[in-house]
Amino acid sequence: MKIKSFTGLCFLAILGLASCQSESGKSSKENTQTTDSITVVKLVADSFQKEIDGKSTGLYTLKNKNQAEAIFTNYGGRLVSLLMPDKDKKMVDVVVGFKSVSDYQNSTEPYFGATIGRFGNRIAKGKFTLDGKKYQLFTNNGQNTLHGGKKGYQDVVWDAKQINEHTIQFDYLSKDGEENFPGNLKVTVTYTLTDDNELKMDYQASTDKTTVLNLTNHAFFNLNGEGSGDILNHEVEIFADEYTPVDSTLIPTGKIEKVKNTPFDFTTATNIGARIKDNNEQLTFGKGYDHNYVLNKTKAMNMFQAASVKGDKSGIVMDVYTQEPGLQFYSGNFMQSKNKFKGGSKDDFRTAFCMETQHFPDSPNQPGFPSTVLKPGQVYKTSSIYKFSN
């Protein structure tokens, strides 16, 4: 099927109504307009058209019958924008991101909205042993490897195929030895925007050599919209009675501990900021929440609920469903106001959060954790969903 690229101008409302229409041939200059305190951003397709490592990037849009929209670029297999209706039926862009590929390339935080691999989260000291062979990865997070190394999947151009107005497919061949991971790994990520306001993410991979992998999406959310302030009054519920505590470098200790009577207990809906400043060693290590939750599930359950988040101003609810055993809850602790988002606001401290479905961090070195090993002949398949309501 011929690749379909989004070639018009997309008008995004950060805190209000948005519309999208094709306007080929018009100026590609970006500008903003403000009407009744609503900032409208013109996201220009030309700003996402670039050649990187000999491959072309573009902008792609998905729509549903409710006027919801999900906009992607194949640079990093990345979610750029996600428009959902709030309690007043106005459209809100709940994903923070940038207005050009160059902005993503130059960001001090490279993971906004990206597909993460080959191994999401951290591997201690960038080392692991597989089939008796020792591997040393590039360490890009202090002494550890984070999100695949120096050049993870967020920095590559994926092959894009827009199946229809609801679905887009991204493909990438991660070659044997890339970032020192073994095996030629064929990866397919399919994003679908359903008429139930679900953004479904289906991951599939196969390898010709035994390897490890842990795929996820790293969207940064603010359910009140970009520029609406911090996310500390967002209400969070996580369906997990346990979590994996970490050391000072955010590597799991190997223990699995109960969340009860700790600031990590979100088994009932609680504001993110309610206990984030508590005197707790784990919060000190993460500078807030940056921890993996061990999700409550049974073997009989295929897709199960991992979390629910509600925007205090918008009334938008995001329910997270997954087949994965873990969920990384990140409260935007390392956002440093060094980047400007597509609506003009900066990435200020804790103005977005992440809910990353995953296997546990450092699994290749933790025999007590669910395995992340993939062998030739096996097919890696997993799905997660962000479902929105108001």
Named regions from a protein language model:
Residues 1-8:
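Bacterial N-terminal signal peptides that target proteins for export
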Residues 16-19:
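C-terminal motif of bacterial Sec signal peptides marking the signal peptidase cleavage site
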